[in-house]
Amino acid sequence: GAPQNGKRPVLLAARNAHKALLYAAALLDFDIQWLWPAPQDAGALCSCPVSAAKLTGALQGLAQQGKRPFGIYITSPDYLGGVQDIAALAEVCRDFGVPLLVDNAHGAYLRFLPQGGQHPIALGAAMCCDSGHKTLPVVTGGAYLHLGKNAPIQDEAAVRNALALFGSTSPSYLILQSLDKCNQVLSEGYPLRLLQCCGYLTRL
């Protein structure tokens, strides 16, 4: 986010965000306004549920301070498997003209459930990162970055240049090859196998 009227840019984020977000804030010099879980929320900090009403209130509060976040950062699924109502949050973000950024590290498989409608991009997120190595057959460290139709940046070259700032000029080709191999697996009947796996789990 670029400075706004000489002020540091602000990101609105659920408090259960991965520490990598803190590293990004330190490197890129932006502030984080936290969305904290309510005291009665089960799981509290690890789950940190954010409702559409809560997000609306937080955005209105920032607006009263003359602040407009450059993005909303939500972790879904969380570390306990809980899933946020991404569709409702995306609608709020559209109303306020702020992009929804989703850490979908633990939900790379969601695209391949019946109808594919559970993935954050399908639900309206502007940008989303999937850690393929967590729930797909990918070597540790392999991940995907997805851009929605409403992403603030649509220029693929610009996105690649931004990623290059944080990447190595000597990447692991084992990881890259595993991502390519995973793509092949995903295109060869993976949704059916995932559905069968879900069926097995329901019988446990």
Where are these regions (language model features)?
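Conserved PLP-enzyme active-site core in the AAT-like
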Residues: 1-204
